[in-house]
Amino acid sequence: LTSHRPFTCKVFIGISLDGFIAREDGDLHWLTSRGEAAGDDLGYNAFIKDIDTVVMGRGTYEPGLTYDPWPHADKHVAVLSSTLPEDADPRVTVHRDLGALLRHLTERGAKGVYVDGGQVIRAFLRAGLIDEMTLTTVPVLLGTGLPLFGPVGGDIPLAHVSTQVFGAGVVQSTYRVQRPS
């Protein structure tokens, strides 16, 4: 499954220096304010140009409903959730489990998949489905919050691809997941 799928799965996410992607209540102001101070789009537009599908969980999808305009209007959006009603939003498809989602992506002819949200990223990592991760680290320690990483089923070796330093002390590193040969 991991080496024969017709699409690549990439992560592009902001984290605190201590590895959190949001405060415990989901607040992202600590991230967005520093991202704005860093200037630039932090490489997001270059990243997203090769993406045709965005996969996220309910915890990422629901806060995104406040954005106007909808940020993924030109992408297929798939939400992995056991609780979101399947007909909740005509802009997205809802999938109950990872297997069903992967079959859907293959049937749709997905090529570049942006995997977003902590729980979904961890599920994809555990399944060996992430190919590349771009982590944008902002210089703040939150102490507590929603972690990006947690149990991922063992070591996941990474190869460093690049690192960029932006304004306001924001550091972005990209890693490719190494597969056993």
Q: Which residue stretches match the model-derived regions?
A:
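Enzymes that bind and transform nitrogen-containing heteroaromatic metabolites
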Residues: 1-181
